[in-house]
C-alpha cells in the first residue's frame, strides 16, 4: 500500500492538465459527443464560457486519485460523485481527497476536484477495502 489510510489524512493530490484534444479523444472513447465538450461556438451559444470537461472524465480523474493512493492489493468498493461546477480545458484540475474514517480493513473517503480558484467543482465519496 503506497498511502496510509488514517482518519483525517489527506490523499496525495493529483493535478490533471486537460486539453481540448483530450476532450475530443474522450468523446470518441465514451460516445459522448455533446457539442459543449468540443465546439467552442456551440458551447458559448448555450451560455457557457467555452467547452467544458465531461463530467465522467472528472469522475475518472477522481477514481485515479483514489486507486493511486490505494496501490496494489486494495479495492475500490463504492464510488459516487456529484457535479457542482465547470472545469475548462487549459486550466489545471486539482483532485483532492480526505480520509473521513478508517478501520482495520476499510476506509471512507471524501473526494473532490478544484478549479484554480479553489472552488469544488465535483464532489464525491468512496469506500475502499484495504489490503
What are these regions (language model features)?
Residues 1-12, 89-131:
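HotDog/MaoC-like acyl-thioester-processing domains
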Residues 32, 39-41, 87, 104, ...:
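Acidic-enriched, low-complexity/disordered segments with a strong bias for Aspartate over Glutamate
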Residues 1-75:
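Hot-dog-fold acyl-thioester-processing enzymes
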Residues 18, 83, 128-130:
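Hydrophobic residues in beta-strands and at strand termini
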Residues 66-95:
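Mid-chain, well-packed structural core segment of small domains
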Amino acid at each position: 500500500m503506497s498511502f496510509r489510510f488514517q482518519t483525517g489524512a489527506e490523499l496525495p493530490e493529483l493535478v490533471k492538465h486537460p486539453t481540448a484534444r483530450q476532450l475530443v479523444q474522450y468523446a470518441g472513447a465514451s460516445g459522448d459527443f455533446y457539442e459543449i465538450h468540443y465546439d467552442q461556438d456551440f458551447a458559448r451559444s448555450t451560455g457557457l464560457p467555452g467547452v467544458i470537461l465531461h463530467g465522467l472524465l472528472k469522475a475518472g480523474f477522481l477514481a485515479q486519485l483514489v486507486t493511486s493512493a490505494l496501490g496494489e492489493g486494495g479495492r475500490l468498493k463504492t464510488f459516487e460523485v456529484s457535479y457542482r461546477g465547470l472545469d475548462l480545458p487549459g486550466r489545471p484540475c486539482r483532485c483532492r481527497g480526505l480520509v473521513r474514517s478508517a478501520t482495520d480493513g476499510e476506509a471512507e473517503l471524501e473526494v473532490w476536484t478544484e478549479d484554480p480558484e479553489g472552488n469544488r467543482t465535483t464532489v464525491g465519496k468512496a469506500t475502499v477495502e484495504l489490503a
